[in-house]
């Protein structure tokens, strides 16, 4: 959203769906930072759940802005990153925030790291890797690292979005 509010990218519907699926009351907080949003999270009791609005509505998020991260940190006592797929991004909510809170890897992150270690450490041979994704540029370093370790390397990279069926 390039730092601008976009109703189609709002997390409000996610909060509503999460509440319905979990049978929990989910407090949706429409503004991620500021005194009012922090006051709401500070009033929470054990077992209550809140969801902040999409952080990418703030340019500071993707800029890994320390002041923004410090404002986000005001909501919490610890930071747990359980999103292995986003761990490579240096954003305020995934990187800079760890300067202001004790930071831990969550159970899914730990499992992913253990699997990666097993695959790259001393795996049973032959070894094949399947690497996919939309951004070729973000895969170059990974591919260069994997090539000497693999007998087979398959790369599925989405190059473009066709506007009409290809036949």
Q: Each predicted region: which residue ranges?
A:
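Active-site loop-to-helix "anion-binding N-cap" substructures in soluble metabolic enzymes
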Residues: 1-160, 164
């Amino acid at each position: 959203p390039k730092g601008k509010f976009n109703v189609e990218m709002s997390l409000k519907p996610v909060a509503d769906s999460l509440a319905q699926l979990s049978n929990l009351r989910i407090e949706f907080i429409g503004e991620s930072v500021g005194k009012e949003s922090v006051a709401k999270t500070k009033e929470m009791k054990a077992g209550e759940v809140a969801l902040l609005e999409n952080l990418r509505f703030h340019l500071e998020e993707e800029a890994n802005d320390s002041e923004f991260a410090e404002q986000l940190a005001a909501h919490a006592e610890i930071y747990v990153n359980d999103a292995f797929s986003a761990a490579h991004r240096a954003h305020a909510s995934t990187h800079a925030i760890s300067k202001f809170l004790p930071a831990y890897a969550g159970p899914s992150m730990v499992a992913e790291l253990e699997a990666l270690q097993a695959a790259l450490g001393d795996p049973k041979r032959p070894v094949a890797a399947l690497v996919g994704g939309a951004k070729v540029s973000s895969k170059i370093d990974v591919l260069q690292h994997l090539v000497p370790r693999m007998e087979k390397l398959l790369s599925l990279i989405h190059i473009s979005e066709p506007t009409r069926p290809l036949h």
